[in-house]
Amino acid sequence: SIYDVIVYNSKVKISGKLPITEKSVVARDNEFRFKVTDIKGFSNPSQLTFGGQTFELRRQSEEFVANVVFPKGAKAGDVIDFAFTFDLKGTESLFFNPSRDGNTTVAISSSYPHPSFQGALLPNTREVKDDGFNATWSVSSFNSSSYDDMGVKFVDPANPYQQSMRSAKYGMLIIILVFVAG
C-alpha cells in the first residue's frame, strides 16, 4: 500500500479503589464490569485482583465481567482495591471515559513523538519530546459526565503523500485564481 497507517501496541493497567455500599454488602451476586467498545484489539486480560483475591474475567458482548466476593469482615464504607492489565492494539487513537462516581486519573506514556490530545477533557500535564510523550489527566466526578472522553490521536505530520497532494491542490488554486482575476 502507498499509505502508512499508524498502529499501536499498548499495555494497559487499570487500578482503583471502590467504596463498598450497603446495597452491595447485602447482595449475594456482586459483579465487577468494564467495557471495551472495540474488542478486536483486546488481548491477554489478566485476572482481576479485587480486595486481595483473584477472580477470572469473562467476556459478555462488549463487557468483561467478574463475579466478586468481598473479603471477610468487609462492611459498608470500606474501600476495596482492584487491579488488572491487558494488551490493546489499535489504530490512530486511544480514548478513555472517566468514572461517573469518583475521581479518575489516566497516565499515558509513549515513544511516539507526534500526539494530538483530543476529547472533551485535555490533559492536566503533558510533556512532548522528540523521543515520545507523557500525559496525565485527573478528572473528578464534579467536572465530568459519563459522555466526556479523553485521549490521544497519533498524528502523522505531513508525510510526502500529503505534501504532494497539498502542492497539487494549491497549484490548481493559483492557476484558477490567475484566470478568474484576468
Predicted regions: what they are:
Residues 121, 145-151, 169-176:
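Hydrophobic alpha-helical transmembrane segments
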Residues 159-182:
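Core alpha-helical transmembrane segments of integral membrane proteins
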Residues 1-148:
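Soluble non-transmembrane domains of integral membrane proteins
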Residues 139-141, 156, 168:
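Generic secondary-structure transition motif, activating predominantly at the C-termini of alpha-helices
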Residues 150-159:
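Juxtamembrane membrane-water interface segments that cap and precede transmembrane helices
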